[in-house]
């Protein structure tokens, strides 16, 4: 990824960055429109997710997370920008004529070949079950449920590590630091997700944030008491409570919010590091 730094011609471009190499030219049969009605609101028009709204129109690129085209080699034709994610995507031309998008693995170049199957080479971009991978393999796009497609480790620069196998389960260390069990029959893609420098990208101005469909975040302490438990007071007042809370009165900043009766509770060997 080649990051271009804007010249400081105006305050809005100061320290702003943009990717100057990867462009977007999607195929018409692999894209479709999205209907965004009432950003962050439910069917009654009530805000259920704050700080969402506006944003540029997007076309959704249909990504092949399942990688279920077995033992048919494909060639990387393009590496493209996707407005729906931080990671890049690449267009694959398979030997039987079909074309699909996949997540771009780090280091993959135009002209490289990839394949998915049960016993394929341990090569960057290839997809295969965990049972056929050696220990220490760096992987991404990991399935949780067999045949459902990759759901874990799909963000830009993300990578997980296969650290153990025992019985029917494999032990993975995820980017968050969590160590959990996954069925060895589930598939994953070898390598790391591309666009590692996405976390170093600077938007430069508030308008760039609005283009992404994200609205401003306002602190509760500067609101009125009717709007937030931290609100009110004369001047710059403290929150007036023993512990900080959410806008709805629940404990915030450190309290665990994960449900205790989830089925995956027994599959997590070590919680994610904060």
Swiss-Prot record:
Pfam families: Ribosomal_L2, Ribosomal_L2_C
Presence of keyword Plastid: yes
Localization: Plastid, Chloroplast
One example GO MF annotation: structural constituent of ribosome
Chief localisation class: plastid
Description of how the protein assembles with itself and partners: Part of the 50S ribosomal subunit.
Protein name: Large ribosomal subunit protein uL2cz/uL2cy
């Amino acid at each position: 990824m080649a990051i271009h730094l804007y010249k400081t011609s105006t305050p809005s471009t100061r320290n702003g960055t943009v990717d100057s190499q990867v462009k977007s030219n999607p195929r018409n049969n692999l894209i479709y429109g999205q209907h965004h009605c009432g950003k962050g609101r439910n069917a009654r028009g009530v805000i259920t997710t704050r700080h969402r709204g506006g944003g540029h129109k997007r076309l959704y690129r249909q990504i092949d997370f399942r990688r279920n085209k077995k033992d048919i080699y494909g060639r990387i034709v393009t590496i493209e920008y996707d407005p729906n994610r931080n990671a890049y995507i690449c267009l694959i031309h398979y030997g039987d004529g079909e074309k699909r998008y996949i997540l771009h693995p780090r280091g993959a170049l135009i002209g490289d070949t990839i394949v998915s199957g049960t016993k394929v080479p341990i090569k960057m971009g290839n997809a295969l079950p965990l049972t056929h991978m050696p220990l220490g393999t760096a992987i991404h796009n990991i399935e949780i449920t067999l045949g459902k497609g990759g759901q874990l480790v799909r963000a830009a620069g993300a990578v997980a590590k296969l650290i153990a196998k025992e019985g029917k389960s494999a032990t993975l260390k995820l980017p968050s630091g969590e160590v959990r069990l996954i069925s060895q029959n589930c598939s994953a893609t070898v390598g790391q997700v591309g666009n590692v420098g996405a976390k170093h990208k600077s938007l430069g101005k508030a308008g760039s944030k609005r283009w992404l469909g994200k609205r401003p975040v306002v602190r509760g302490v500067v609101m009125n008491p009717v709007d937030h438990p931290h609100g009110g007071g004369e001047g710059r007042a403290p929150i007036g409570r023993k512990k900080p809370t959410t806008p709805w009165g629940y404990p915030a900043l450190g309290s665990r919010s994960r449900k205790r009766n989830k089925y995956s509770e027994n599959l997590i060997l070590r919680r994610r590091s904060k």
